[in-house]
UniProtKB/Swiss-Prot annotation:
Gene3D superfamilies: TolB, C-terminal domain, TolB, N-terminal domain. This is Tol-Pal system protein TolB. The Tol-Pal system is composed of five core proteins: the inner membrane proteins TolA, TolQ and TolR, the periplasmic protein TolB and the outer membrane protein Pal. They form a network linking the inner and outer membranes and the peptidoglycan layer. It holds the Pfam family TolB_N. It comes from Actinobacillus pleuropneumoniae serotype 3 (strain JL03).
Length: 426
């Protein structure tokens, strides 16, 4: 594969970031391909609804926990009981079916919204012990965010890992030959809205570290330029418009700079520019094409794809430039670093692959076809990417341990370039 041809072809705080009207519209909704047989069993009892509720809060929580790959929720038809509070939980009923943790709760309409209350119950003690509980009000339009909040708290209490169910994804939808949309939705595909529409290609969205901006590639001026789009105001700024093509933007961890690729000197090289624009500085200067930069969490290192050795391969180099070390093996590209800096997620052999940066061990995560553009959840637990299904590009989800796989089927378009947001809540 030639890199140059690849480059040219190719609740609360949350609502403050987005000026567009958010509805329950969804382009894509998670559909399970492969569940997890060895994950921790958990029971999420249907939440008691005190009045009409527009969403099944308990099911949303169960789906979130399942999607992480860490839990296997008990099917509702196999629940031995449906308690509404910890006081109603009979520990023996649950331990008899191998369940140590039970989530119960209620949803009650309030003025203009709902009160969501939950308890996480440990059934290993008798009577059952409450491990975590909470109650909070959410606007009616944010009922799914209320469910995701419960999921985050339950997930963190059990795993000691911060939950990422209130995050979002950005992606590009292509319909026909001259209709492109940059869309943003909840991580599970719900509450989608359009950021920008164009008759020219849109590519490679990337989030700023605070989740308030998206950098992406647009051809609206008949050339590939990198723009930064403020999601609160809707304003846009061109930050990279060198001669030739500009693409593959990546925000630095502090949000002050953007690394990108440009072929202004003939071959592709990595440049760094201020997040508000300015004069770019050139980072690579080797023979061959260099593209797809990705920052290490501490901002000291850039991972990128280069064909300097004859075929695409992931390399690593210090931000000051200089020598680069091969990291991914021949045929690897599209690398992203996990937020803890321990793993590299990339494409190799057209599959999503995880590489342990300490040991060098690799693991194939996906089992789909012609995979591209992996993006990691901020807690490192899940990976979203695009793949080819028939004649369509679709979004796929896989847990970072490879045990849970799902697709997000979309209708009426090609779904490409997914990008997972950072945490959007404190």
């Amino acid at each position: 594969m030639k890199l140059k041809s690849r480059f040219t072809s190719i609740i609360g705080v949350i609502t403050l970031f987005f000026s567009q009207t958010v509805t329950a519209e969804s382009d894509v909704v998670i559909s399970v391909d492969e569940g997890v047989s060895m994950a921790q069993p958990i029971a999420v009892v249907p939440f008691k609804a005190n009045g009409g509720v527009p969403a099944d809060v308990g099911q949303i929580i169960a789906d979130d926990l399942r999607n992480s790959g860490k839990f296997t929720p008990v099917e509702r038809s196999k629940l031995p009981a449906q308690p509404g509070s910890a006081a109603e939980v009979n520990s023996q009923q649950w331990t008899d079916i191998g369940v140590d943790s039970v989530v119960v709760g209620q949803v009650t309409p309030t003025g203009g919204g709902y009160n969501v209350a939950y308890q996480l119950v440990d059934t290993l003690s008798n009577p059952a012990t409450v491990l975590a509980q909470g109650a909070f009000n959410v606007p009616a339009a944010q009922i799914r965010q209320g469910a995701h909040t419960v999921s985050d708290q339950v997930f963190e209490k059990i795993t000691q890992i911060r939950g990422a169910f209130r995050t979002k994804i950005a992606y590009v939808v292509q319909r026909g030959v001259s209709s492109y949309e940059l869309r943003v939705s909840d991580y599970d595909g719900y509450n989608a809205f359009t950021v920008v529409k164009s008759k020219e290609p849109l590519m490679s969205p990337e989030w700023s570290p605070d989740g308030s901006r998206l950098a992406y590639v647009t051809f609206e001026n008949k050339k590939a330029q990198v723009v930064v789009h403020d999601l609160r105001s809707g304003s846009r700024r061109v930050v990279a418009a060198l001669r030739g093509h500009n693409g593959a933007p990546a925000f630095s961890p502090d949000g002050s700079r953007i690394a990108f690729a440009s072929n202004q000197d003939g071959e592709l090289d990595i440049y760094v520019v201020g997040a508000n624009g300015g004069k770019p500085s050139k980072l690579t200067a080797n023979a061959g094409n260099n593209t797809e930069p990705s920052w290490s969490p501490d901002g000291s290192t850039i991972y990128f794809t280069s064909d300097r050795a004859g075929s695409p391969q992931v390399y690593r180099m210090g931000l000051s430039g200089g020598g680069a070390s091969p990291m991914g093996g021949s045929g690897s590209y599209n690398a992203k670093v996990s937020s803890d800096g321990k793993n590299l997620i990339m494409i190799a052999g057209d599959k999503v692959v995880k590489r342990d940066l300490a040991s060098g061990g690799t693991e194939v995560l996906s089992s789909t076809f012609l995979d591209e553009s992996p993006s990691i959840s901020p807690n490192g637990i899940m990976v979203i990417y695009s793949s080819t299904k028939g004649t369509s590009k679709v979004l796929q989800l896989v847990s970072a341990d490879g045990r849970f796989k799902a697709n997000l089927p979309g209708a009426g378009g090609q779904f490409k370039f997914p990008a997972w947001s950072p945490y959007l809540t404190k």
